Amino acid sequence: MNVFWEHGYEATSTDDLLRAMGIGRQSMYDAFGDKHRLYLEALQLYETETGSELFGRVTRAPSPFVALCDYVLSVAEGSSLDLSRGCFYVNATTELAQSDPDVRAMVRASGARCVAAFEEILKEAKRRGEVDPSVDERVAANFLLNTISGLRVSAKAGVPPNDLRGIASLAISSLKPR
């Protein structure tokens, strides 16, 4: 996963993958089929790991909304610290989603799952009075997903960390009761 994440699909050679995995060419083909299939599996692993992080935060936090806010702020912090890699899914979107139907389908499905999870968190937060009653949870969930993606792209483009934190804080405050 890390080789694709750091270099992208096109810039990663089969030899790069073999060296990173410490296996022979035939073993890779036997296990994964081809480079493309391995890339799709790496994307799936990334989604599983990042989804587990958010789920863990939600289950440990005093409220799901607090966890979501912390997650958005941590994206701003983490994005500013890891400029070279960015977000694997954002990278896949910008590199391949337009030309690769498999990647496009994975990115869309992952985004839909993320929006659904955010929407449920926002519904619960609204019920608890943590989110403004006028907020449309579906629109806000999409807004947060796009804010997170934008933070990651902006960090990769060199936007200063304080600006990233400010963007994340503004996104969160726009949802709170007025």
What do these predicted ranges mean?
Residues G78-S79, E124, L144-P161, S174-R178:
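Amphipathic C-terminal alpha-helical segment
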Residues A67, L81-D102:
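Amphipathic alpha-helical segments used for helix-helix packing
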Residues V3-R37, E41:
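Helix-turn-helix
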Residues V66-C69, P101-R127, V139-N142, G166-S169:
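Amphipathic alpha-helical packing segments from all-alpha helical-bundle domains
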Residues Q44-T50:
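Short, basic, alpha-helical segments at the C-terminal edge of helix-turn-helix-like DNA-binding modules
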Residues E41, L54-R85, E137-L144:
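Hydrophobic alpha-helical connector segments
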